Amino acid sequence: MRLVIARCSVDYTGRLTAHLPLATRLLLVKADSSVLVHSDGGSYKPLNWMSPPCTLRVAEPDDDDVGRGVREVWTVQNAKSDDRLVVRIHDVLSDSSHDLGVDPGLVKDGVEAHLQALLAEQIDLLGSGHVLVRREFPTAIGPVDILARSAAGETVAVEIKRRGDIDGVEQLTRYLELLGRDPLLAPVQGVFAAQEIKPQARVLAQDRGIRCLVLDYDAMRGLDDVDSRLF
């Protein structure tokens, strides 16, 4: 991983257009070719990014950029779309690279991991006709618990929690924003699945067009035998 702290401006073009004016920022270049732009705030969410597959090309600035004090231009081009991230670097304050090796991945809570495995096996709980695409679908900001397709062929991203709160909805929102940039996946529906969903989280999810799904852990494990109940 390469970490560069630099005074830079950033422009994103493609399905979306965004501009970040000149400021000091952290640029992350990961081994999977993804590039993320961070500020000293906003928690762990980048200001902008380009997810893989993409290529990074470093070039000398043209005369106009030189006149504005630009010393180096990074062009990050997505391999599957016209999305492009252009970083104009004025000053580099720090530049270091580190080999992090192979990461073992996130070790999820035992119940959450089991819920994910059970939902992948019982994908029709999302709705009739849904099919599993992949568990732990990789993105530049972490793996999506489950990626599926609806009967209509639309992409469905599922975030699974034992107890669903606002942080879980925010996490899913970031995944949806990122996945929605990929023309092969867009549009992407979101499903927030948990054993228990807090009222505030449900309201936030519904406001963002995210469907909520309450998971019955015992029933999914086959422990809730309705025919054997006395009441």
Curated annotation (Swiss-Prot):
Entry-linked CDD domains: NucS-like
Major localisation: cytoplasm
EC number: 3.1.-.-
MF annotations from Gene Ontology: DNA binding; single-stranded DNA endodeoxyribonuclease activity
UniProt keyword Transcription, yes or no: no
First-level EC class: hydrolase
One cellular component term from this protein's GO annotations in UniProt: cytoplasm
Cellular compartments annotated: Cytoplasm
UniProt KW keywords: Cytoplasm, DNA-binding, Endonuclease, Hydrolase, Nuclease
NCBIfam families registered for this protein in UniProt: PRK03298.1
Function: Cleaves both 3' and 5' ssDNA extremities of branched DNA structures.
UniProt record similarity statement: Belongs to the NucS endonuclease family.
Protein name: Endonuclease NucS
Source organism of this protein record: Beutenbergia cavernae (strain ATCC BAA-8 / DSM 12333 / CCUG 43141 / JCM 11478 / NBRC 16432 / NCIMB 13614 / HKI 0122)
